[in-house]
């Protein structure tokens, strides 16, 4: 059985990237929360 995590930069960015987050209201909330917390990386 192969492992479940098969890294891909493209897929990672397309599902968890900044632009994807900004598309939905919930995603923007995530970015806002991470900004408020002072995260160095807001999204991938």
Curated annotation (Swiss-Prot):
Molecular function terms from GO: structural constituent of ribosome
UniProt-listed GO biological process terms: translation
Keyword Transcription: no
Ribonucleoprotein among keywords: yes
Pfam families per the UniProt record, alphabetical: Ribosomal_L34
GO cellular component: ribonucleoprotein complex; ribosome
Keywords, alphabetical: Ribonucleoprotein, Ribosomal protein
InterPro entries reported for this sequence: Ribosomal_bL34, Ribosomal_bL34_CS
Entries under NCBIfam families matching the protein: rpmH_bact
Similarity section: Belongs to the bacterial ribosomal protein bL34 family.
Protein name: Large ribosomal subunit protein bL34
Organism of this sequence: Methylobacillus flagellatus (strain ATCC 51484 / DSM 6875 / VKM B-1610 / KT)
Gene name, Swiss-Prot/TrEMBL: rpmH
